[in-house]
Structures are given as structure tokens and as C-alpha cells.
Amino acid sequence: LISLKDSIDSGDIDLITRVYDTVIQQSATSMMRTNYEISSLDNIKEAVIRSIMNSKLLEAQYLGIELYIEIPDVIDHLPIKLIDLIVLFTGLVDNAIETAKGSRRPFLSIAYFKQDNKQLFIIENSTKTNRVDIAKRFDAQQQNSAHFLTVLDSYPQITLSTKSDHYRLRQLLEMR
């Protein structure tokens, strides 16, 4: 848009046309090819969580990661403080995006639903390697991991399970 404004300011019609053709039209085309629909997040009633999830999913999509989202239940009650849920969700999604990048067929799948008296947040993604060493990932991102683990440890009613094999990583956050 800045390039377009500069070309308009210069009054050069050829430059305006060239900027439009190379920048604006290509951007519009790539935005139209998206497979992710923001309405997939409609059942998350907390606007902040919905907004952050949307931002992270658009980031993944921009990186060429195929997205699959399933949120069948209305999520209108947060089992923990909002700020802590943000830390946990962003940590899990960031981890999934990072490990999916560069994989053969990058994908990220999120399911968030209620079961009995629990909320389950499951995120699964492709990986570059057969197995991801989760402990090494936490060591490599020590500062972010420390905050993530502190939040996780402060809620005994929350369980995080991870499994990695067959070029996939699965993270399950169970909140009672």
C-alpha cells in the first residue's frame, strides 16, 4: 500500500499500474486462496482468546501450513484465568507452528471441546523428524518455556500430555 501511495503521489500511471499488478493483485489472490475460516472460532465466546487464536492461525496459514479446526461446543466458561489460558494456548500453538514448518506436508489440527466436566484442547501437527524431543524444545526456548511451565504448575486441575511419533506431534491440554 505504501508503494501504491508513492506511485500515486508521483503521478506516474505506468508505475501505479505496475505496483497494482505486482503487489495488490497478488496479495488479494493469496488472501482469497485461504482455507481457514474465522467462523471456525465462533464457538469460543471469549473475544480475546478468539482473537489470539485467529492471529496464530493466520500466521500458520501464511507459512503454508494447512489448517483443520473443530470447535463443536460453545466454550463460554474459562476453567482458569484468562491471562494464563492465553499463555498456555499461545505456547502450544507456537510450538505446533514451529515444529510443522518445513515438514513434508505441513498441517496443524486443533480441536477444542467439552467432555463430561472437562475442556479438552488438542493440537496435532506434522513434523520434520519422526519424533520431536519435547525436552530439547523446552530447553531451546527456556524463557518462554519457564513461564509456560509456571502457569501449568499453578493449576493442579490441568494436565498436559504430549506424544510425538510417525512425523506427528500431539499436545493435549485437559482442563477440569
Regions found by a protein language model. Name each.
Residues S103, F107-N117:
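Short beta-strand/loop element within the Bergerat-fold HATPase_c
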Residues L4-D9, L82-P106:
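Conserved ATP-binding N-box helix of the HATPase_c
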Residues I69-D73, K114, T127:
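Heptad-repeat coiled-coil segments of the DHp/HisKA dimerization-phosphoacceptor module
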Residues Q119-T150:
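Glycine-rich/acidic phosphate-handling loop/turn and adjacent ATP-lid/helix
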Residues L41-K45, L67-L88:
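Conserved short strand/loop->alpha-helix "switch" segment adjacent to the catalytic nucleotide/phosphoryl-transfer site
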